[in-house]
Amino acid sequence: MYQLFRHGIFQMDAEKAHNFTIQCLKLAGNPLFKPILKSIIHAPKGFPKMVMGVNFPNPIGLAAGADKNGDAIDGFGALGFGFLELGTVTPVAQDGNAKPRQFRLIEAEGIINRNGFNNNGIDYLIENVKNARYKGVIGINIGKNKFTPLEQGKDDYIFCLNKAYNYAGYITVNISSPNTPDLRQLQYGDYFDDLLRSIKDRQTILANQYNKYVPIAVKIAPDLTESELVQIADTLVRHKMDGVIATNTTISRDTVMGMKNAEQQGGLSGKPLQHKSTEIIKRLHQELKGQIPIIGSGGIDGLQNAQEKIEAGAELLQVYSGLIYHGPKLVKELVKNIK
């Protein structure tokens, strides 16, 4: 059935297809239709897992970028995910970069996007989270607005952290999207140190205010040198971050040279990212020595490479592009088999 649906949406522009899918899942998540979706999917229960102090119903999650505004929480939840990471969301709504900004690399099962954190703002997302019936874990991925100067970037993260804290199972700090100018600079040196210090200080205040501890993860890029990766791992440990997501999209085109749309600017996700993200997970695991859990993301399209990420050191996994190319059966297969 999904192959038929895929054939239809692949006739559309990639972003229009995405928006159409979100609307379909929003409708399917409606209490009137959700039982029908669940009866079609037959999602297995999966294996519960405690990570970052949070009890996940199963270790398979939806990666950020799929449901930026939390419009289809219950629809995605019905597919069997143990957790959903919503966003990236910013303090105020923004349109993102000029269209077209999403491109399929069909022969490689990849996607290039240069969206630029298009979203309806943190308040809109929080309202959707409040209204959702989904029983799994909700992560909220936060970023900075495009026109906020880098020097004031931490203020945007703190603003979103304040808003999201009471409604999130965990929060992700996204400093690794290649589509917001200079954002990746926040991964390095004094910027990184200052940002993490400010976030941890605010987390302590919020934990006392709400009488609960909400873990905070950092999402990193795959395009890191060895010394950069070592430095990032050291900084994460020093600031006692609760988790790290490896990885975001890549700016490399090594695996897709010459293919249609490969020349488009933006972050490349999907199968071409598979090996690179697994290697980053492996090296990160060696550096972190089990002190901080890793959430693996990047190119998961089947059980074998999902298992490779677990063996490399990931404790939880996230999918997005693989869902576009392979449909809900991918989620079902992973939930059924990954522990």
UniProtKB/Swiss-Prot annotation:
The EC number(s) this enzyme carries: 1.3.5.2
Keywords: Cell membrane, Flavoprotein, FMN, Membrane, Oxidoreductase, Pyrimidine biosynthesis
Binding residue positions for substrate: 68, 113-117, 174, 179, 248-249
InterPro entries: Aldolase_TIM (IPR013785), DHO_dehydrogenase (IPR050074), Dihydroorotate_DH_1_2 (IPR012135), Dihydroorotate_DH_2 (IPR005719), Dihydroorotate_DH_cat (IPR005720), Dihydroorotate_DH_CS (IPR001295)
Residues the record lists as binding FMN: 64-68, 88, 141, 174, 219, 247, 270, 299, 320-321
Entry annotated with the keyword Oxidoreductase: yes
Cofactor binding description: Binds 1 FMN per subunit.
GO MF annotations, alphabetized: dihydroorotate dehydrogenase (quinone) activity
CDD domains to which the protein is assigned, alphabetical: DHOD_2_like (cd04738)
EC category: oxidoreductase
Predominant place of localization: membrane
Single GO BP term: 'de novo' pyrimidine nucleobase biosynthetic process
SUPFAM superfamilies: FMN-linked oxidoreductases
Family annotation (HAMAP family): DHO_dh_type2
Protein task: Catalyzes the conversion of dihydroorotate to orotate with quinone as electron acceptor.
Assembly: Monomer.
NCBIfam families, A to Z: PRK05286.1-1, PRK05286.1-4, PRK05286.2-5, pyrD_sub2
Family according to the record: Belongs to the dihydroorotate dehydrogenase family. Type 2 subfamily.
Protein name per UniProt: Dihydroorotate dehydrogenase (quinone)
